[in-house]
Amino acid sequence: CGHATLATAHCLKAHLNYPNEDICFKTKSGTLNVCFKNGLYELNLPNRVGKPAALPGEIANALNIQPKEVYKARDYLLVYQSQTEIETLKIERSIFDQINIDPGGVIVTAVGKDSDFVSRFFTPQASILEDPVTGSSHCTLIPYWFKRLQKKELKAKQLSKRGGDIGCIYKGSRVQINGAA
């Protein structure tokens, strides 16, 4: 995921004294370039624009709060009314794990109180139900929030137990995420 790529870049820079500002990773999903600028690690990725979709019954039945909008790209994107709904959202794992959306997951999002938007990311049938910080989910989140808020530069917060702040830039067919180590 994007967050792990940024963490790997940080390890190379901070602990192995990698001399360049740009680091190129060859991955199964293609080449990922990380740039270190102004104390932040930046990663440029292709966007994944979601299309309106029906919510699968297994997902709907697993949620304690139903979304107001549903989109599908690689992941399902569930849009909620408020940050409070995202914070209090619970998933009944035994029901949620009945759906197979491999390699995707479920993103839940809403307008943030102290950021442009907040999110959480869940993966059925995975060893960890909720990912702490998910760079790849922002490939879908950034185009959605760009269109809704009409802002190219966005501040995001992932509300998992560990959580994280993500800088986001909409670049047409691509998105850029950045964060500190």
Where do the model's predicted regions map?
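Active-site proximal loop and beta-alpha junction motif in alpha/beta enzyme cores
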Residues: 1, 6-181
